[in-house]
Regions:
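ATP-dependent adenylation/nucleotidyltransferase module used to activate substrates
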Residues: 3-158, 168, 176-186
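Internal nucleotide-binding/catalytic subdomain
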Residues: 159-204
Length: 204
């Protein structure tokens, strides 16, 4: 099987919608895309509704980078699709992973929808992951990030071809989180030293 890395940022000059959380990973991903000539728009989706702090952080970062930001309250669908499943699994004695449910059903669905609305050819996130393209089968596959300690490919295995064929992971080749932070520092981003989130996104 002949496989090659796809989404070569040096060759692509298209509009992209990037999931912007307000954290350093997605902010750095936006910076990298802009440096490569992409026309970047940020997208912040509020999973619980009324998360003014999270929204404000995303707005500050978007302003610092110089990109527009789209906001959407997805709390109703998130509760129905993700939280209800989470509670049900716990009641059955299983340990659920809400990201595995959210990514294909909420996060990337919304990214694609808004990308189409603004005419963006691609979507992107700050995940540590890579994509491979199999020419023989004309199919895209998730690949582990170069940084094994930060790899997030296991949370994205349920994404379909409609998503993978338009998806860019700017941080996939990074070997350490320090590389990410250093880029943010050089650009004087306010979130350059922001700690990584260790909690489930809907549990404070």
């Amino acid at each position: 099987m002949q496989m090659r890395m796809t989404r070569n940022m040096e060759l692509q000059k298209n509009k992209v919608l990037l999931g912007l959380s307000g954290g350093v990973d997605s902010a750095t991903a936006a910076l990298l895309l802009k440096e490569k000539g992409y026309d970047v728009t940020g997208f912040y989706f509020d999973v619980m509704g009324g998360n003014e702090n999270g929204r404000a952080e995303a707005e500050v970062v978007a302003a610092q980078i110089g990109i527009p930001l789209i906001y959407e309250n997805v709390s109703e669908d998130f509760h129905r699709v993700v939280i209800e499943n989470f509670v049900s699994e716990y009641r059955c004695g299983r340990t659920p992973n809400p990201c595995i449910i959210c990514n294909p059903n909420i996060k990337f669905r919304r990214l694609l929808r808004h990308a189409d609305e603004i005419g963006a050819s691609y979507i992107a996130t700050g995940h540590y992951c890579r994509i491979l393209y199999d020419e023989a089968n004309d199919a895209y596959y998730i690949r582990r990030a170069a940084n094994d300690k930060k790899d997030q490919s296991y949370m994205l295995y349920r994404l379909g071809q409609d998503v993978l064929s338009r998806l860019i992971f700017p941080l996939g080749e990074f070997l350490s989180k320090e590389e990410t932070r250093e880029i943010a520092r050089k650009s004087h981003l306010s979130n350059a030293e922001k700690k990584d989130s260790q909690e489930i996104c809907f549990i404070d």
